[in-house]
Design a protein with these regions (language model features):
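Bacterial N-terminal signal peptides that target proteins for export
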Residues: 1-9
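C-terminal motif of bacterial Sec signal peptides marking the signal peptidase cleavage site
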Residues: 17-20
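Extracytoplasmic small-molecule ligand-binding "clamshell" domains
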Residues: 27-97
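An extracytoplasmic/periplasmic, membrane-proximal ligand-sensing/linker region
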Residues: 31-53, 225, 231-296
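A local structural motif
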Residues: 60-70, 85, 162-177, 213-215, ...
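Short helices/loops that flank or line small-molecule/ion binding pockets
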Residues: 75-89, 102, 136-137, 180-200
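Acidic, polar ligand-binding/catalytic clefts
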Residues: 79-137
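Pocket-lining segment of extracytoplasmic ligand-binding domains
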Residues: 130, 141-239, 246
């Protein structure tokens, strides 16, 4: 009799143990968090708050919690994607190319701009009262770039200056501001003479810097830069990658999401990646003597 009781208790404990383990595994699955990375286009805390509706939308579509992450600089997102601490990034093309080159990150989608086509341009902006009318006039001036890994904030506009015969280390003095909004502020405050940024920066930050709509003008435009890319860490689950792709491809069917992407990133939708377009990014980096394997 005693043996039967003991065996019965053992069975109960085994069942309870299996049940508890099952619950723990279920809870673990429910608590899985996917990190979505962004470069610091603006104040990091504010950006994370602004993109929360995007994270919520993707959470619903993918069936897993998605949280936004903004690094303090551009390379921080690239490194996060490489290590797997960031599962995917919605990042500029040069950052995407770096991630592919350095950690075999997977290009999933590219963005469509307001024209419905992929791509955008970098611009050099000056104040209207600066007297700077040509690229040659930039010699001897103060220039604000955004980040060494920024496509529109350094690589492409820097290449424009180099092609115009300007030695960046000898003919100008320059700094990296850390953000497009910060560069704009430097220009408006007359702390620099020229800034490198993206087309439409004055409209994007008009709320914070209304003078940008009246006091600055474009000096020069770059060749077309491939669109912002959705890039997944090689460590991200393949099924989740497919769910992410489908959710973003369906985004333009959701008016609120489309409006938010357009307002924040000038993105009207996503499409499959044409990898050949990104070869141009590498070519432009070579003009700047940038070794993709050594960028840190």
């Amino acid at each position: 009799m005693r043996n039967k009781i003991i065996k019965g208790l053992v069975s109960v404990f085994l069942i309870l143990g299996i049940f508890c383990c099952s619950k723990k595994e279920e809870k673990k699955s429910e608590e899985k968090v996917i990190k979505m990375g962004f470069v610091p286009l603006k104040n990091s805390e504010q950006l994370v708050e602004d993109v929360k509706p995007i994270a919520d939308y993707l959470s619903q579509k993918m069936g897993v919690k998605v949280e936004a992450f903004t690094a303090s600089n551009y390379i921080g997102v690239v490194e996060g994607i490489g290590s797997g601490s960031v599962d995917f990034g919605i990042i500029p093309p040069f950052s995407a190319v770096l991630a592919q080159k350095q950690s075999n990150a997977q290009p999933l989608l590219t963005s469509k701009g307001k024209t419905g086509k992929s791509g955008y341009t970098a611009e050099l902006y000056v104040r209207k009262d600066s007297g700077i009318k040509s690229l040659e006039d930039v010699k001897g001036k103060k220039v604000a770039f955004v980040d060494p890994s920024s496509s529109s904030g350094y690589i492409y506009p820097g290449a424009m200056l180099v092609k115009a015969g300007i030695n960046l280390d000898k003919d100008i003095s320059y700094q990296f501001s850390g953000g497009h909004d910060k560069s704009l502020q430097l220009l408006l405050n007359k702390d620099v003479d020229v800034i490198a940024t993206f087309d439409g920066v004055e409209e994007r930050y008009a709320k914070d810097f209304p003078a940008a709509l009246t006091d600055i003008e474009k000096l020069a435009s770059s060749d077309t830069i491939p669109g912002i890319m959705v890039t997944a860490s090689s460590k991200m689950d393949k099924d989740l990658q497919e769910k992410l792709k489908q959710a973003l491809l369906d985004m333009d069917k959701d008016p609120k999401m489309k409006e938010l992407f357009t307002k924040m990133f000038s993105i009207t939708g996503f499409e499959e990646v044409d990898q050949t377009a990104y070869n141009k990014v590498e070519e432009t980096a070579k003009v700047m003597n940038v070794d993709l394997d050594k960028v840190k």
